Amino acid sequence: MSHPDTTSKDAVFQWRGIPQPGQLLPLGLQHVVAAVVGVITPAILVADTCGLSSADKTLMIQVSLILTALATLLQLFPIFHRIGSGLPVIMGISFAYIPTLQAIGGEFGLPTILGAEIVGGIVAIVFGVLVKWIRPLFPPLVTGTVIFTIGLSLYPTAVKYMAGGAGSEWFGNAKSWAVALITLAVVVFLNHFTKGITKLASILIGILTGYVIAYFLGIVDLSGVGSAAWVALPRPMPFDIQFVPAACVSLGIVYVVNAVQTIGDLSSTTMGGMDRMPTDKELSGGIVGQGVMSILGAFFGGLPAATYSQNVGIVTVNRVINRAVFALAALILLVAGLVPKFASLLTTIPQCVIGGATISVFATITMTGIRMITEGGFTPRKSSVVGLSVALGVGITQVSGCLAGEGFPAWVNTVFGSSSVVVAALMAVLLNLILPKEPSANG
């Protein structure tokens, strides 16, 4: 990465250097557009699950934007060359955590989520330090199975939102479904029939379209926006923090899985933009930095950060790796996070619009898992690993209380009975270790 400084048009293809202003702004905005929906949506989903007020939901969105910016800057400018990867990546709030966060939040509330995040961040740091030795436990077969399960477990959330949001006066209303389906149609059309910025911003444009329609149908409530401040800094410890061991274990497992996904994203970034694989030091620093920011985020009421695959995709297509481009994107998100009125406006997005926009994201997550699973062909061994892991993971969570009877301590139901991702991850690792290998298998 020791490229010479340059101010030519080729500067955007070098890690260091000063890109021309005419290149810098559009390239930075491209990454903002790709990331912003993914940054704010998890905060909205978790806030709704935990029953937060409009003001607290605004705060969570604000903190999500700020933490995304700081986490990205940490990756671009590592501390002590150990905390952060020093690679061109955009960080954000990951959907991969949502099923487990919703399970914890629904049972224990937001304080327990934040406590589990701190423990999860420590787990990520340990994983990053030991990445060379732990990585072999998570081949594409195992990681793909978990990602596939994550996608499946998010579908009910998307459908509830498309219907108007459980408990909402608009739930099951034909207007909610009309707005959701129009939003989805716009996303699908732009994603498959257009190119360039409109394709990249398909979800954002879909949300804007759905929002306008919902506004004229009387679904949008703007009453809380006027009271929000124009500029404000987030304060530490806005919520209590509690540590529930079972919740910490559940989320810690997801942090491990997400660390493996980070390895994939960093590898795709360096292969696509730098024609090389990442070094062990870069992988370690990237995961450690992710853990550090998750711990910091918990103290400010934020959610876990992770690398953003959609932004990795941009790098592999345009091969722009200049850190000034990514730093500008981070600064734009940071400024947005310092404006509570903007965050408050985002809380007015109707749930049917969010559902219509995100169900395509969740479908993509599911298919990404399938693509990883089928890498190198599909064998009877893979069928057993995936089938049994998903069957137990999804099946157990569909039968309420099946692990809460006599003979089971309460923590068993909390860890294994509420999150399909945790069960699927453990089963996939175990089966991949004990089932006999096949010469043609890639797992």
Model feature map: region roles:
Residues 1-27, 222-235, 271-278, 430-443:
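Intrinsically disordered, low-complexity non-transmembrane regions of multi-pass membrane transporters
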Residues 104-223, 330, 335-443:
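Membrane-embedded alpha-helical modules
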Residues 102, 191, 311-322, 326, ...:
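Interfacial segments of multi-pass membrane proteins
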